[in-house]
Amino acid sequence: MSFTADLHLHSRYAYACSINLTLANMAAWAKVKGIELLSSADFTHPTWLAELTEGLQPSEEGFFSFEGVKFVLGTELSCVYKQGGRSRCVHLLVFAPGFEAVHGIREMLAGLGSKLNGDGRPTVGASARDLTARLLDIDEACMVVPAHIWTPWYGMLGSKSGFDALDECFGDMTAHIPAVETGLSSDPEMNWGVAALAGKTIVSFSDAHSLPNMGRELTVFQGDAGYRDLAVGLKENRVEQTIEFFPEEGKYHLTGHRKCGISQTPRETVRSGTRCPECGRPLTLGVVHRVGELSQVGNSSDQRARRPYTKLAPLIELLAYTMRKGRTAKSVGLAYHRICDELGGEITVLTQAGYDDLERVGGEGLALAVTKVRDGKVEIVPGFDGQYGTVRPAG
């Protein structure tokens, strides 16, 4: 048994997120994508919590369901604090076993001064270590997973406000952190060489701020779809595989300065320095550079702990490419839903559908595009300094 999960999502009550992120729409898109388990997202927001309480029905122990899709109570918290003489900003994914724990978490956050009526991703004036301890005091079944750990400003290991090691961030709570999220700008292999992550399960989720971006990264867990199975899956690395963005498409993959159009590989950064050659301002160090700083030859993860992963380009992007239209064009959206309906969901289309079926339903151009991406035959312009990269089928 296994289940496919996207556990980093947001509701319409999180800043810079689509107003279409309703419970009904999220469930509908999960079916289109082929996702079996979603995070409820943003459970600290009072209006969204009321919608979750009314709409979600108890399912397997610790899980809930809405229109046939399973949900786990989850949210993202932004810890902003000072430690070691530096300002820190670390985003954490938090999961709770039930609504009683959620209410306890909200009460605790309010006591720390967090404004829960605003952003669905509230800011918390506590260290990642202290917040983890407080969460476990509320319910020992709560789980904490550092989010997009390499993002420069908001990642646990980010170049701007992060740390150099897991235990620097979490101290005596490190043993209670079962897993880390790769983020869009890194893939599992990039994380395998980082000694600071040894013994931690590597997971990938979408961090979707809109419905079409749900499932752009996923983790397939072994076991049944229950809260205990999820907890064991995270703690014991019971991951069957992850589905990945091409990390080069992430918006912080390379070092650079977007305003001046400057991007650099790690080798170029070592040679040229960390200031923009055009304006002299500091460059935003990319994820691939930061990974290199923290990787140590001979201290990579146990190969037995490594799990398979598959890099894919979103179907909507492949359709936009083959149809020569923008990804938000109505005709692209109609084609997307028709193909997913006929072939059994986006994940199936991208990973399993045969060439003949792809050609029959989507045309020769789509069949060729999907096949090339599966074979790794792509043309890439890497992202940098907040600008997404592009991935296109080669040729």
Feature locations, PLM:
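Active-site environment of divalent metal-dependent phosphoester hydrolases
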Residues: 12-14, 40-49, 80, 101, ...
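Functional cores that coordinate and move charged inorganic groups
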Residues: 164, 168-171, 180-254, 258-262
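Extended substrate/RNA-proximal surfaces in nucleic-acid metabolism proteins
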Residues: 2, 50-178
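An N-terminally biased module of ancient metal coordination in phosphate/nucleic-acid-related enzymes
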Residues: 1-87, 377-379, 390-394
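Active-site neighborhood of phospho(di)ester-bond hydrolases with catalytic His/Asp-centered motifs
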Residues: 5-7, 38-43, 72-75, 144-147, ...
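Cys/His-rich short segments
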Residues: 241-310
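Low-complexity, acidic/Ser/Thr- and charged residue-rich accessory regions of DNA metabolism proteins
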Residues: 319, 324-395
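Histidine/acidic-residue-rich catalytic or RNA/ligand-binding cores of hydrolases
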Residues: 15-18, 49-53, 154-161, 192, ...
